[in-house]
Design a protein with these regions (language model features):
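An N-terminal, well-structured beta->alpha segment
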Residues: 3-110, 201-230, 241
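Conserved phosphate/anionic-ligand binding catalytic regions in large, soluble enzymes, centered on
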Residues: 44-64, 150-153, 233, 237-249, ...
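Short acidic, glycine/serine/threonine-rich loops at helix termini
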Residues: 104-109, 134-138, 156-162, 183, ...
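Proline/glycine-rich low-complexity loops and linkers
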Residues: 125, 185-207, 316-399, 407-408
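Glycine-rich phosphate-binding loop
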Residues: 143-151, 155-157, 162, 288-319, ...
Length: 424
């Protein structure tokens, strides 16, 4: 029998005595009664850390798990910080989620806690990709936003990403300040649960068209697309939230011959057809590549579950598909964008791009050859968004990205956008 730190027993017992549901109490009691204490220890040896990117962890009962209570406690901390930052303003936040197990429950919990604190919620009626949350924050003038997702992690995981009013993930000083507020919430009983449904306003499907109209403005080659509109393109959302929006974006660009992998088209948080829902891994693209060969596709695309990253595969001279790595894709996008901007007389010497320090230096060299500034930032797309915000009114942002398949073209979104990147 494993010896258990008394502090772990005390924490589990305090959860038992708190205002949680009976099912969770029964699960905790079962952990306490079990002769194998490993699950008890892992569930309660610490609090699930709210880091600079929010929460991420395995779902289950306990302080070190993603559940309605850890989500609620994080939301209470974020709500407290928003109320401190904007004491005399009507605060609103945007919320959505991807396909993962419990995502509707966690998103509902987030919305309820915000409204219980007098904060208005703009709530997507259906799951939508991460970039649409970022766009919604900016479009509706929200002060913050929450995306419930664990990106490409295994099915056992879930997460909670916090955004600020510019549409980017929170950065200094807000990230550290939010963490401080969340750490003050030490019990489920510290959460205000008295929800106010009148403060929830649903974002309807017509918002999709507003977003797609912005995506359409990114098109730089309408004539070329018209001439090749029947080019076969295969797309897989890998059971995620981009299954509707990527085909729609490709269509507004002018592409008509789009084949979606049927077995991976429906949202499913168990990701039954892949080991990991990560487009960086060739295994996750097996079905998409098979369909690509079947329809003689010129391009095979796939997004991760929350639709912020994408992968591209192209056929070689033998008809076999090659998965481009993030540096290759980023370099191609950079050269294409700058070539078209120069061709259309849009380069004035005040344009810039941004990439991360681990991304290929080839992108910087391409930018230099076009006379375009290329800023290099620390890893994390929030740092790219921070530069875009800092340069507003001074320079014009064209695009940027990181080698882990994250790209952003245009500045109407302030996080990785796999939907618009697929179109480009």
């Amino acid at each position: 029998m494993t010896n258990v730190n008394p502090m772990i027993i005390a924490k589990a017992t305090s959860w038992l005595k708190s205002n949680i549901d009976e099912k969770s109490k029964a699960e905790i009691q079962s952990l306490l009664d079990s002769t194998d204490k490993s699950e008890l220890i892992d569930s309660f040896y610490r609090d699930l850390e709210f880091g600079t990117g929010g929460l991420r962890g395995i779902m289950g009962v306990g302080s070190n798990r993603m559940n309605v209570y850890t989500v609620a406690m994080a939301t209470q901390g974020l709500a407290n910080y928003l109320l401190k930052c904007f004491p005399n303003e009507r605060i609103s936040v945007a919320i959505t989620h991807d396909c993962r197990i419990n995502n509707t429950l966690f998103a509902d919990t987030t919305a309820n806690v915000f409204t219980a604190n007098g904060i208005k919620v703009k709530y997507f009626k259906e799951m939508r990709p991460t970039p649409m949350l970022s766009f919604a924050i900016r479009h509706f003038g929200c002060k913050s936003g929450v995306m419930v997702t664990a990106s490409h992690n295994p099915k056992e995981y879930n997460g909670y990403k916090a955004y600020w009013e510019d549409g980017g993930q929170v950065v200094a000083p807000h990230d550290i300040n939010i963490i401080t507020e969340v750490q003050k919430i030490t019990s489920v009983d510290d959460v205000n649960w008295d929800k106010n449904d009148s403060l929830i306003e649903y974002i309807e499907e017509d918002f999709d068209l507003i977003y797609l109209n912005e995506v359409k403005k990114l098109s730089l080659s309408p004539i070329a697309i018209m001439l090749q509109r029947n080019m076969p393109i295969v797309f897989s959302p890998i059971h995620g939230a981009s299954g509707k929006m990527v085909p729609a974006a490709l269509k507004v660009f002018g592409f008509e011959n789009i084949h979606v992998v049927k077995e991976q088209a429906e949202p499913d948080g168990t990701f039954p057809t892949v080991i990991y829902p990560n487009p960086e891994e060739a295994e996750a693209l097996t079905m998409a590549l098979a369909l690509g060969k079947e329809v003689n596709a010129e391009l095979v695309l796939a997004c991760d579950p929350d639709g912020d990253r994408y992968a591209a595969c192209v056929p070689d001279e033998n008809g076999n598909f090659e998965l481009l790595n993030g540096n290759q894709t980023g370099s191609l996008i950079t050269y294409y964008l700058l070539s078209k901007w120069r061709e259309q007389g849009k380069l004035t010497g005040k344009e810039f791009m941004v990439n991360t320090i681990v991304t290929t230096e080839l992108i910087d060299e391409i930018c230099k050859s076009f006379g375009v500034t290329c800023y290099s930032v620390l890893t994390g797309f929030k740092n790219i968004a921070e530069v875009i915000l800092a340069q507003e009114g001074k320079q014009t942002y064209i695009g940027g990205g990181e080698e882990s398949y994250g790209y952003l073209v245009g500045d109407f979104v302030r996080d990785k956008d796999g939907v618009s990147a697929c179109s480009i």
